[in-house]
């Protein structure tokens, strides 16, 4: 008989199967066992098959095997325990609890209590979980006891006490990657990211050393082409998946989305169907392609429901919908999952999302809701600021740390509300109203990078506050001057425009040279660099808006390599369309006079865009937008614009000849 290219001779099945199990080649063992007809009716065969299925995390199949064993040998209570454990791991908590209550073997009492406590914990019934743990008679395993206590304290948001239990567990039982991860998670929730990263580094270092077969980092080295390692027991035992996901969460929280992606890329290579829910959730949030795949992944997880679905999924799906301005979709999700609203959304998060959705139909009502939120959190911030000042003069440094942490948490809640209040007038092009909202929130937020960035955008859009806008943009650029491409292209473009509008052309040129040199150094190793392209597009658009179409359009053509390069896409074409349409409007009204050579250059540019943009979509679609119609292309739109310009030239020539 052949199995995985290996011939098994008669009489050597037992030896071969046990060798596979010893070497943790469980899938091969399953394939061999399933090829033996007697396995499904014998105790030995079902026991081996159930064990292998359990180790490969196919808990449904494992539970089926142990269910047969319970009926086949009812006098062996261990099989009933394994059956209940398999059901629990499969997320079938009610069935697992029902089976566990029928177990009355004294020698298994502590294990049954442990399982029942885990079921209660999974059902978020923490008081029952604690009472069951207290009934255990065997307290010799101090590390396990401390870890369980830490988990219950963590769920009660008592992170400092939970951390102490985890540290005690590590001291009592030696290093355990799962307990070390729990300790790192406590530091993460306490905003102590450096300590959390220390634990993560140790988990990863030991995982790489002890399990080189997992191929940590192989995806990055092969650009995603590494062979999947699946979900072997070694991966579950190593804690690597949890560690890398926590590292990704830390990077994401600190605003380093690229670093978050890299952390997920360092995970042992697996196919998407093999990914655990937490990894799939985090990949959805950091998807570099766009929001579509991320939204679909989160929606898929939400449909799986608890306990498989991470509790953060519901809120993040709604926030991602709002980020992509899919407010109707967010409203539908809220309406379809009302049972999750009170379970997974805090009152603050619900009120914020409700205000964002309401703003689409009744902005005034949304402003009132956001105003109530802002006043409540603002009052709390003032009282916490006073508390921090009191603690600064007291000798208790721990009280000061707690007060500062509370203030930072409240500020994190206040900032999105302040941004949302400014966003409502921004959407209506009421930039003066948006500035007024920023001034109202300056008391608390003026030192936060997010507030300063968006305040700069508002001042820039005012059209007469370029100097003040530059004062906000400059620190952002200076902070990343050695890595200028880490700065958003829109920030660089707006700063250049602000310099030009305040007669600081030399500063604008120096900044553009800096960006150009950085792009030349980077080359094409990490994909297309569009920073300088976007800067030139924005500057060209500015000159067109001021009526200087000759220089503005030449700048735009230069930015897009004359329309023949890879920079031609829906994003960049939008700038071209606007400026050419502005030119056509001015020519038709005879408010613009353009030299013949400039018109010929524009026609040549549009002809090139037509040739190279034949298959490139010209419009940006939403992440979940699907239409049966063929989207318009840049080539088609360029041809129409060129035809309009030619017709205007013919008309103007006719008028000139008539006169």
Curated annotation (Swiss-Prot):
TPR repeats lie at residues 3-36, 43-76, 143-176, 178-210, 391-424, 450-483, 533-566. It is found in: Cell projection, Cilium. Required for polyglutamylation of axonemal tubulin in sensory cilia. Plays a role in anterograde intraflagellar transport (IFT), the process by which cilia precursors are transported from the base of the cilium to the site of their incorporation at the tip. Belongs to the TTC30/dfy-1/fleer family. It comes from the Eukaryota. GO terms for cellular component: axonemal microtubule; cilium; intraciliary transport particle B. Keywords: Cell projection, Cilium, Cilium biogenesis/degradation, Repeat, TPR repeat. Pfam families: TPR_16. GO terms for biological process: intraciliary transport; protein polyglutamylation. Disulfide bonds: none annotated. GO terms for molecular function: intraciliary transport particle B binding. The keyword Amino-acid biosynthesis does not apply. This is Tetratricopeptide repeat protein 30 homolog. Its main location: other.
